[in-house]
Curated annotation (Swiss-Prot):
This is Lactate utilization protein C. Belongs to the LutC/YkgG family. Pfam families: LUD_dom. It comes from the Bacteria. The lineage of its organism: Bacteria, Bacillati, Bacillota, Bacilli, Bacillales. GO terms for biological process: lactate metabolic process. InterPro entries: FTHF_cligase-like_sf, LUD_dom, LutC, NagB/RpiA_transferase-like. HAMAP family: LutC. Is involved in L-lactate degradation and allows cells to grow with lactate as the sole carbon source.
Amino acid sequence: MTRGTIQNRDAFLQNIAKRLGRSPRLSGVSQPQWDYAPQWTVFAGYSQDDLLSALREQCKLIHTDYIETTSSELAGALKQQVAAYGGGPVIVPDDPRFAEYGLSALLHDEWPAEQTAVHVWNSSLGRQNIDAAEQANVGIAFSEITLAESGTVVLFSRNEQGRTIHFLPKTYIAIVPKSSVVPRMTQAAAYIHEQIEKGAVVPSCINFITGPSNSADIEMNLVVGVHGPMKAAYIVVTDR
């Protein structure tokens, strides 16, 4: 991923300052320190097991299947959940973690031998990736950060992982390393901000996804699957 550039910033800020009737403030500006920060107290002191328990309970409220497994059993758990959702076609990002978590044989050998189509995102294929996502029954990706309070997975889009993997397939499975679970969005935003401060290249598209697609009108009629997958599952890998 290449770093973007900022253009016309100074002219833009000078125009705002002019409208405010003052000169631009180029120094002496610091981030305010708030007297109260209740957002940091949610789940304060929780262990990783406590956070996992909170995530498990939240999944019940957001209509999301919750599965716990270990690295050695992950391939079997993933295969079983894909079968529960009706099988392939499957689409996945080009992510080295699939190999690290022992899923290469399932993706490249076992499923193809069973006539389950697997598409690995390839940026050189362009529109073909989007077409594959549209035709896929299951999209699978790793959660970068997982919010226990809301049951949200945070997904970073990049050349090897287009955002349509998360939205176009009929169903979706997030692989959740236990170590990725944090209390809430506060910690996720702090992590992303920290990466920016370090000069890291942050994805232009960061998706916060909470279970399957849910929409409700003014009469509180819930409709599932209008803007994304109709079903979602989180497979938590407890030894990662």
